[in-house]
Regions:
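Compositionally biased intrinsically disordered regions enriched in Thr/Gly
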Residues: 20-295
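Bacterial Sec-dependent N-terminal signal peptides
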Residues: 1-28
Length: 295
């Protein structure tokens, strides 16, 4: 039987006040935290959704659900295949919606973690050179899988709202890894996802800015280097730094750029992240980005 530790079954509704001057209140936000565990896996899920109070918030909610579905239905595969179906129930019922994805994802992880553990135990049982003491110790040390999924709001203005999707997964290897969809910026005028903040064709003309940002990241982490040393250390082709797979997102008067693990650097170097002033990026912003930024 599964040991369950589910943090409140009902979603928490929270009012977020926008501006004290305007007296306007932002739409209701629904937050749900779920957790489940077995002997070989722990699953945690924290999701924040806008309540569907109007057309814009409903569209944003559906965009988040689509992204959540895309990630959780593929958590144990690198192929472009679904491991369980899209939720066809009422998308306005947050408990049922997220409960479905938690149950499906946890069931999938539980099955594969159990299979992995039994395979490891089988190898140990076949090793005639192991003492009983070592065998018992290694059985006790069988790795426990972990999966932590979060989708939370990280920024909002009257024109746009930014949500961030991030998940940590450990499947018994040397270390875990961080993946996810990254930042999703929605236009609040109608709730559509702004797919590109930076024009994807801007990679080459933006090289000096990307170099500047990365040199700043390494300097802040105690590593001083020049441009030549930087380019020689990165996992890039032809000396060209790519735009990050995660879309940059607005924060104040800047855009935040974050590279994922192994995207351009080693695991030990973390996830290079830096901010660049919007004013320096004007030639490279998409028309949609300029619209939500009021440019």
């Amino acid at each position: 039987m599964l040991n369950k530790a589910i943090v409140p079954a009902a979603a928490v509704l929270v009012f977020l006040a926008a501006s004290c001057n305007s007296g306007r209140k932002e739409p209701l936000v629904e937050k749900l935290s779920l957790e489940d565990t077995t002997k070989y896996v722990t699953f945690k899920m924290d999701v924040e959704l806008p309540a569907p109070v109007d057309a814009s918030s409903t569209a944003i909610r559906e965009g988040i659900i689509s992204s959540l579905d895309d990630q959780l239905t593929r958590i144990t595969t690198y192929e472009d295949e679904r491991m369980f179906p899209f939720y066809e129930g009422d998308h306005n019922d947050t408990d049922a919606l997220l409960g479905y994805y938690k149950d499906q994802a946890f069931s999938l992880l539980s099955k594969e973690a159990e299979e992995d553990a039994q395979e490891r135990i089988g190898y140990l049982m076949a090793d005639d050179e192991l003492s009983e003491e070592d065998f018992a110790r290694m059985i006790e040390e069988t790795p426990k899988w972990e999966y932590e999924y979060s989708f939370e709001k990280i920024g909002e203005t009257p024109s746009y709202v930014v949500y961030f999707s991030r998940n940590y997964i450990y499947m018994g290897g040397a270390h875990g890894g961080i993946t996810g969809a990254g930042a999703l910026t929605f236009d609040k005028s109608d709730g559509h996802l702004v797919e590109h903040i930076i024009d994807p064709s801007s990679t080459v003309p933006m090289q000096s800015l990307l170099v500047k940002g990365l040199l700043g990241y390494y300097s802040e982490n105690g590593v001083e280097m020049n441009e030549e040393e930087l380019l020689g250390s990165l996992f890039i082709e032809d000396g060209i730094i790519p735009l990050p797979g995660w879309e940059p997102y607005p924060e104040g008067d800047s855009l935040v750029f974050t590279y994922q693990q192994y995207e351009i650097a080693s695991y030990a170097e973390g996830m290079p992240s830096f901010q660049l002033p919007v004013n320096d990026l004007l030639p490279y912003l998409t028309s949609e980005a300029k619209a939500i930024l009021g440019l």
